[in-house]
Amino acid sequence: FAVLTGCLRVSKESIFTGLNNFRVLSITDIRFDEQFGFTEEEVKMLLASYGLESHLEETKKWYDGYRFGDADIYCPWDVINHVDSLCVNSNAHPQSYWINTSGNDLVKRFIKIADNTTRDEIERLVAGEFIEKSIRLDLTYNEIDGSINNLWSVLFTTGYLTLDGTPTPNSFRLKIP
């Protein structure tokens, strides 16, 4: 049994790849949507268990923002590291604990080939706005280079972007978490 998150769909699921009996749930599925991170109630309980209740707002501001199915989810890696830092120093400031934990070569490759429209959309996201895009939840690594529009599917399925509201069948409203 394994759970893979923050990656594109695995291609060629078969008995010959070692990935048979494979079940895929995407970020938009509501089944188990609260199981892929911490809910706000769980974050409150965690902070309370260490006497850190006064740090809820900063924790929410920094680490809440992911949407799985119908659930707003906190990033567990960031929350755990922040609580650990606060246990060592109650004046510790929130940080981006994900920095330099993954290779961003794929994102850099997309940005190099981005046209002006794509660059403008990236700037809108960085400015805190949202964009509306069609997303391929079934996109695999073998298909990535097929279109610059796959950038949005990659950023969404790997957690760099999250939903802003409920998606329609043809359109996802995306923002930076």
Specify the residue positions occupied by each region the protein language model found.
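Phosphate-binding site recognition
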Residues: 1-177
